[in-house]
Each structure stands twice: as structure tokens, then as C-alpha cells.
């Protein structure tokens, strides 16, 4: 009888110990959790839309506290990936300005892996050494659908995410090559799913947004529906989220092709974010076309997205 009591007492003591450990873990987790209100203040920018209907933040200059974000993310010991495709005639003109500016302004102070997808042997230009940055030049082959650049890009990107990128980085961005960073693109942009607002269509009426209107297309968004119009120049998030978009895009293109329907990469992107709401939106400051007049809403251009052949 005494032996049974001793065993019960030991079990009770062990259970209490586990509860104590769980309480300590929960408290520590609470202390480490970063709340939106800790770093984001939409009231500082009453001149623009700063929060979506589903309560995702829209990042404008003045709305975020980078010091709070830096304190949090440095404890997380993160690595961020940036993928860019340098193929054909675009490489010679656009790659060097992209990489030179990105090495200076993209996630400074954090480990960064640049994934450069190329269709031919490439010797990178010399850049200032940064021990936190590394470069992977990844050769891609030409296949029968290679002429469809966006299809090729998403297929190759999805393969690399599955094969190795998901094990190497915590967050991943894919950007167009004809972009030049002009100021810091920092940790305020990090989230599970990141979408870029279109610099032209953001300032237009929602009824005029150029969604896919053909009902037979996978990318179709009916009239009267839709949230924003997203630009295809930047997509980001955690690797599995970027992979999910790439896979859904490829699936949509193949289904439409089988049915004799054509659409565009950006329209598939907008359909994806209509169904799968992004957790963070980047304002037009993060992908501004320098040929546009600068409106008063845009305080600082983070990236200049140059039209092809104007850089």
C-alpha cells in the first residue's frame, strides 16, 4: 500500500514539474512574440491606406518602428534569400545595378543568400565584401516552353525551393532584374506572405483594376470583387508560401492552356492573393516606376523599378 502511495506521489510530482515547465515555456514564448502594435502605427499615415480589410499591415514609410523590428529579428538569427533571373539580353544591362544596389540596401546586417538564375556562364562583377552575404549562381536549361519567361521562372524557382532553398533561408523574395534599390529594404518587409501593391493601379479606382475578366480562365475575378491590384515585380514570404504560389500559378497556366485560354502572370498572381490573402503588403514605395511623377504619398522610394530599356 505504501509502495502504491509512493508511486502516486512520484507521478503527481512529475506532473507538477511538467506543468511548471509548460508554464515557463509559455511565458517565454509570450515575451518573445512580436505584436503588430509593438512596431506598426497606422495613425502616422492618415493620407494613405495602411491596413487591409483582413487587418494586414500596408508598409509605408513612417508606419513602422525599425528599431523594434531589429531587436526582435536579430534574436531570431534569420537568413533571407533573394532570387533573381538573369536570362537573355537582360543580364548585361540590368544584373550589375541590381546586385550592386541589393548588396547595399537589401536586409543590411542580416545573412542574405542571393540566388541568381542564369542561362549561360556568368562572371559576377566585383562587389564590396560582406561576410553576411553569399551568392549562388544557378544554371538553368532551355526547354520547349522557355520562351514563356514567367512560366520558366516559376517552374525553376519552385524546383530550387523544394530542392534546397527551403532548408537555407527563413524568408525568400523573388524580384525582377530591372530594379535598383535606392534605400533600405529591411525587416519591416518580412512576413509569412508578402505582396507588392502596383505603383500605377494603387492610385486608380477599384472598378478599373485590370483583373482577368474571362470566366473560363483560372485567373478570373468577377466584376465587383477584388481587393487591390498587386504587381508581379516582387513576391515574398516564407519559402513554403512562395512555393505554394508558384505551384498554383503553374497549375493555373496548364489548365488554361488545355482549355485554350490565355492570361498573364500578374493576373494569376492577383487571383492567388484574392483567394489567399497576403499577411503583409508593401506600398508602391517599394517598387516605384521612376518614369511616373512622384505623388505626395510616396515619401521615400525604396526600389526603382525601371521599365525595360530605360535604365
From Swiss-Prot:
Matches recorded under InterPro entries: Glyco_trans_6 (IPR005076), Nucleotide-diphossugar_trans (IPR029044)
Lumenal side: 27-311
Topology of the protein relative to the lipid bilayer: Single-pass type II membrane protein
Record's cofactor remark: Binds 1 Mn(2+) ion per subunit.
Residues binding substrate, per UniProt: 85-90, 176-178, 198-201
UniProt keyword terms in alphabetical order: Glycoprotein, Glycosyltransferase, Membrane, Signal-anchor, Transferase, Transmembrane, Transmembrane helix
GO molecular function, one term: hexosyltransferase activity
Domain of life of the organism encoding this protein: Eukaryota
Pfam families assigned to the protein according to its UniProt record, in alphabetical order: Glyco_transf_6 (PF03414)
Ranges that cross the membrane: 6-26
Entry's Gene Ontology BP terms: carbohydrate metabolic process
Gene3D superfamilies per the UniProt record, alphabetical: Spore Coat Polysaccharide Biosynthesis Protein SpsA, Chain A (3.90.550.10)
Alphabetical list of PANTHER family matching this protein: GLYCOSYLTRANSFERASE 6 DOMAIN-CONTAINING PROTEIN 1-RELATED, GLYCOSYLTRANSFERASE-RELATED
Protein name according to UniProt: Glycosyltransferase 6 domain-containing protein 1
The gene coding this protein: Glt6d1
Amino acid at each position: 500500500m505504501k509502495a502504491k502511495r509512493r508511486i502516486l506521489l512520484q507521478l503527481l510530482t512529475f506532473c507538477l514539474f511538467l506543468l511548471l515547465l509548460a508554464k515557463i515555456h509559455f511565458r517565454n514564448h509570450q515575451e518573445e512574440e512580436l505584436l503588430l502594435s509593438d512596431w506598426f502605427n497606422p495613425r502616422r499615415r492618415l493620407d494613405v491606406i495602411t491596413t487591409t480589410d483582413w487587418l494586414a499591415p500596408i508598409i509605408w514609410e513612417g508606419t513602422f518602428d525599425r528599431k523594434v523590428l531589429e531587436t526582435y529579428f536579430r534574436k531570431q538569427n534569420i537568413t533571407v534569400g533573394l532570387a533573381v533571373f538573369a536570362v537573355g539580353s537582360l543580364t548585361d544591362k540590368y544584373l550589375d545595378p541590381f546586385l550592386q544596389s541589393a548588396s547595399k540596401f537589401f536586409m543590411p546586417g542580416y545573412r542574405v543568400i542571393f540566388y541568381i538564375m542564369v542561362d549561360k556562364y556568368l562572371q559576377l562583377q566585383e562587389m564590396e565584401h560582406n561576410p553576411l552575404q553569399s551568392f549562388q549562381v544557378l544554371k538553368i536549361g532551355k526547354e520547349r516552353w522557355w520562351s514563356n519567361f514567367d512560366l520558366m521562372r516559376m517552374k525553376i524557382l519552385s524546383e530550387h525551393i523544394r530542392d534546397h532553398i527551403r532548408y537555407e533561408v527563413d524568408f525568400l523574395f523573388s524580384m525582377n532584374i530591372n530594379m535598383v534599390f535606392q534605400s533600405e529594404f529591411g525587416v519591416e518587409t518580412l512576413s509569412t506572405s508578402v505582396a507588392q501593391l502596383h505603383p500605377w493601379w494603387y492610385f486608380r479606382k477599384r472598378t478599373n483594376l485590370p483583373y482577368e475578366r474571362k470566366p473560363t480562365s483560372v485567373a478570373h475575378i468577377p466584376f465587383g470583387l477584388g481587393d487591390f491590384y498587386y504587381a508581379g515585380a516582387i513576391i515574398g514570404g516564407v519559402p513554403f508560401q512562395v512555393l505554394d504560389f508558384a505551384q498554383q500559378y503553374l497549375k493555373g497556366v496548364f489548365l488554361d492552356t488545355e482549355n485554350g485560354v490565355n492570361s498573364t502572370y500578374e493576373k494569376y498572381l492577383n487571383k492567388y492573393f484574392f483567394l489567399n490573402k497576403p499577411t503583409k503588403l508593401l506600398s508602391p514605395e517599394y517598387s516605384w516606376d521612376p518614369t511616373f511623377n512622384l505623388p505626395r504619398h510616396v515619401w521615400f522610394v525604396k526600389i526603382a523599378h525601371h521599365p525595360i530599356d530605360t535604365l
